[in-house]
Amino acid sequence: MESSNCKVITPLLSQRHRRMVTKDGHSTLQTDGAPRGLVYLRDAWGTLIDMRWRWVMLVFSASFVLHWLVFAVLWYVLAEMNGDLELDHDAPPENHTICVKYITSFTAAFSFSLETQLTIGYGTMFPSGDCPSAIALLAIQMLLGLMLEAFITGAFVAKIARPKNRAFSIRFTDLAVVAHRDGKPNLIFQVANIRHSPLTSVRVSAVLYQERENGQLHQTSVDFHLDGISSEECPFFIFPLTYYHSITPSSPLVTLLQHENPPHFELVVFLSAMQEGTGEICQRRTSYLPSEIMLHHCFASLLTRGSKGEYKVKMENFDKTVPELPTPLVSKSPHRTDLDIRINGQSIDNFQISETGLTE
C-alpha cells in the first residue's frame, strides 16, 4: 500500500533531446546516398505493405485506371486495324466481321475496357465470336485483371491483419524510475496491454546507445527481469507488467545514473509477444533519455480491489510516480512479522503474522 506521506505527481517532460527511436517506436535514422528506387522495386510487396494508407489507396486507384487505359488503347488499335472505326455498325458490309460492336472512338474503347474488367455485363458493345483477335485480347485482359485484383486484395488483407496493428495496444510508461527493491537500486519501467485479449510468450530486451568521442555509436545490451520469473519470457500478459534492471557494479548504467545530470544516452526497449488468436509475433518499442529517468522515485500502485474482490487496473496511475522515501524504522514484536502481498511488483495488501494468527 502507498505511504501516506508520499505525494503522487505526474512529471512533465520539459527538455527534448535528439533521439534515435521515438516514444512510439519509430526510427528517426536517415540514410543518405543509398540507392532507393531499385531496392523498393525489387521488394514491391513489402514496399506496398509499409506504405501509408493514403498512398496505398492512390496506388490501388492508379493501378486499375492504368489497366483500363492500356487495354482501351489495345481495343482501339484492334478496331483501327480491323477497319471498324469508319464503318456503320448497324449496316456493316457483308464480307466484313466487326471485332467489337460499336467501338467507333477511344471513349467507346475505354468504356468497353471498363465493362470487361468489372464484368458488369455488355450492353450494345460486345465482342464477336468470329473475331479471334478480340477473343484473345479479351482473355488476356481478364487474366491480367484477375491477377491485379488478387494482388491488391491480398495487400489490403495483409496490411489490415499485420501484427504491427496489435502492437499499438501495448503501452510503455513515459518515464522510467530508479528505486530501491530489496535494498538494491533498480531501473524500473512498466508496460500495459490495453486490450482484453491476452498476449503470450512476452520477451523484453533493451539496448543502451552511447555516442563515443570518436563519433561512433556504441551499443550495450541491458538485461531486464520480471519479478521472480526465472525464464526469459512471461507466459501470460493481461495486466500491467513491471520490469527491473538491477544496477550492480557490472551494470552498464551504474556510471550513468550516479549523479543527477548524467551524460546523454538512449535506452531503447523492445517487447515481443505472440498473439493468442493468430500465433503471430508483434513487437513494440520505446526509448528513454536521461531526462526521462526519475531518480529516487517509484511508480504509483495500479492494482486495486473491486467491491466483489476482483482486481482492477487504475490506468490513470500508469504514468504517475511517487517520491521514494526512506523506510522508517519501526520496532516490531519478536513474534510478529509484516507480510506485503505483491502481484507483479504492485502492492495489494499488508498482513501481519503473529502467534495468534493473521491480522490485516
UniProtKB/Swiss-Prot annotation:
GO biological process: what's one of them? potassium ion import across plasma membrane
Ranges spanned by the short sequence motif Selectivity filter, renumbered to the chain? 119-124
The record's subcellular locations are:
Membrane; Cell membrane
All ranges on the Extracellular side of the membrane: 78-105, 123-131
Enumerate the GO terms in the molecular function aspect: inward rectifier potassium channel activity
Matching InterPro entries:
Ig_E-set (IPR014756), IRK_C (IPR041647), K_chnl_inward-rec_Kir (IPR016449), K_chnl_inward-rec_Kir_cyto (IPR013518), KCNJ13 (IPR008062), Kir_TM (IPR040445)
What are the intramembrane segments of this chain? Answer: 106-122
The membrane-topology field of this record reads: Multi-pass membrane protein
Q: Which UniProt keywords apply?
A: Cell membrane, Ion channel, Ion transport, Membrane, Phosphoprotein, Potassium, Potassium transport, Transmembrane, Transmembrane helix, Transport, Voltage-gated channel
Gene3D superfamilies linked: 1.10.287.70, G protein-activated inward rectifier potassium channel 1
Known regulation of activity: Inhibited by Ba(2+) and Cs(+), although sensitivity to those inhibitors is much lower than in other Kir channels.
What does the UniProt record tell us about how this protein is modified after translation?
A: Phosphorylation at Ser-201 by PKC strongly inhibits ionic currents, while phosphorylation at Ser-287 by PKA increases them.
Q: Does Nucleotide-binding show up as a keyword for this record? A: no
Give site residues, Role in the control of polyamine-mediated channel gating and in the blocking by intracellular magnesium: E149
Quote the catalytic activity from the record: K(+)(in) = K(+)(out)
Oligomeric state and interaction partners are given as:
Homotetramer.
PANTHER family named in the record: INWARD RECTIFIER POTASSIUM CHANNEL, INWARD RECTIFIER POTASSIUM CHANNEL 13
Q: What is this protein called?
A: Inward rectifier potassium channel 13
Q: Which organism is it from?
A: Cavia porcellus (Guinea pig)
Q: Provide the taxonomic classification.
A: Eukaryota, Metazoa, Chordata, Craniata, Vertebrata
